[in-house]
Amino acid sequence: MATTLTTAQSLTAEGIADYGQDLRQLSAEELRALFAFASSGKINATRVIKNLIWQAYTAIRDGRRAPIAGNLRSFWYTDIKPVLSRLGVPVEGRRATELVYDAFVELVTRHHLFHYRDLGFLDEGAQTRAVGQTNGTCILFAEKDGRFALMREIAQAYDATALALGGYPSSLATEYLVHALQHAGVLAERPALQLFAVVDYDPSGYWIAREFTAQLHAFGVQEVTLHPVLSTIKWQKMPFYG
C-alpha cells in the first residue's frame, strides 16, 4: 500500500524550503551557499528550479504576487532563466526548459502540492477543446491541432468531447481538460473516460496516446479506456497496433 506524504514531507523530499528572501533577488554567492552540492560545489539546478516554483506559488497564493497570466515558457524566461544564468548553469537548448517542465510535473502530479491553475497559467488548450454533455466522458482526440475541426464535428454529432493535443500531451493542458470536465459535471464520483485516439501509425503516435492516458490517471481519473483509431491515410488498410 502506497504511503501518502504530508506537504511538509514532500517539500523536504524535494529539497524545498520556505526561504525568507526572494531567490530571484539573491546574488550568485548567496545562491551558491544555498544550492551548491557540498562535495563538488556544482549547482543543483533541479533544486533551484523547484524552489523558485514553490516561491512563485506561495507568493501568488498569499496575494503577494499577481498570477502568471502566461505559459510555462514565459515563466522560464521571467523566473528561472535569469537565476540559472547568474549561477553559470547552461540555459540554452531544449534540456534547460525541460528541467522546468519536469519539475512542475513532479510537484503537481506526483506530490499534488498545487495545481497549475493556482499560479494563473493560461489555458492554452481551450481553443482546441470542446466538452460535450450527454457523452462528455467519451473523448475523441487528435494528435495534431489541424484535425481539431474534424474531431469537433464528429463529437458534436454525439454530444461527446473533442480535443486536439498539439503534439506530445501537456500536463498543464491535461489538468485544464480534467477541470473543464469536472466543471461541466460530466465526471461522476468514480471518474471514467473512454478515449478514441486519432494519432499517426508510428511509435510517436503510440506513445502520445499512452502518455495522455497516464496523465489523466495522474489527475485523478480512475478509469481510462483507450481505443486507438487509425488516422494516417496511407495506413488505412492496415490493422492498428494496440
Regions found by a protein language model. Give the residues of each.
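Short glycine-rich or small-residue beta-strand-to-loop segments that form or flank ligand, phosphate
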Residues: 195-202
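Nucleic-acid enzyme cleavage-core boundary/entry regions
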Residues: 1-193, 206-242
